[in-house]
Amino acid sequence: MDGGVGEAAAEQLAAAREQGFDPPFRRQDWPLPSLPCRADGPLIWVALTQAVTPLEQQLNLVHQRVADLWTQPLDQVRILQRTLHCNWKIAHDNTLDDYHVAVAHPTTLHREQGPVRDYAHHATALVNLLVTPHADGGCFHTFGLPPWLHLITWPEGRLALLEVLPRSRDSCCMQLRLFAPSAASGGAPADAANNAWLKELLAFLDEDQALVESAQRGYCSGLVPGPPHG
């Protein structure tokens, strides 16, 4: 259902269209269960089962720390998908790990995330957050959200949502979506700025893809990791 169409209006539209099918569509022949859904931030969230952790618990740090950015009018300005030749867990656990960024991406994302000495960590049972001061003022937030989401926020209101979606034992889909404040998302200057923003993030993600795919090859080679550092 379109997020801008109310339930009653959607029912009326569906009923009118069903009569035009050949043969006529009979809804009782397709007993589809209803799924709970709700809008929160720029997204519509759908629960595929009743036994889910409440959305408030999944997003509690987002609501606490960046509520103004999260609830402002936003437009999705870019979307990109690519296949990673590694399983989703390797990609998810390494892509935005804070110290990994500092070591592996010194000339890309680390320039925005800032020096390690300024790292401030926050966590709940489900969510982790890294907060660093941004060079342009305000704070840069990097969230890890269940089950395979990463959210990055810039102090002026831009958001990047990175999803690592499972495909097979040794591949996954990386989806990047960029959101900008609605008041500043139109026109040629905004389009050029969004292209530059996407280019910057892709430089980081190109580096990251090489790293996580090499980790997958290492595990497949029979590598046995050593003990954790004490």
Which role fits each region the language model picked out?
Residues 1-49, 57:
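Rieske [2Fe-2S] iron-sulfur-binding domain
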Residues 35-39, 43-230:
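C-terminal catalytic domain of Rieske-type non-heme iron oxygenases
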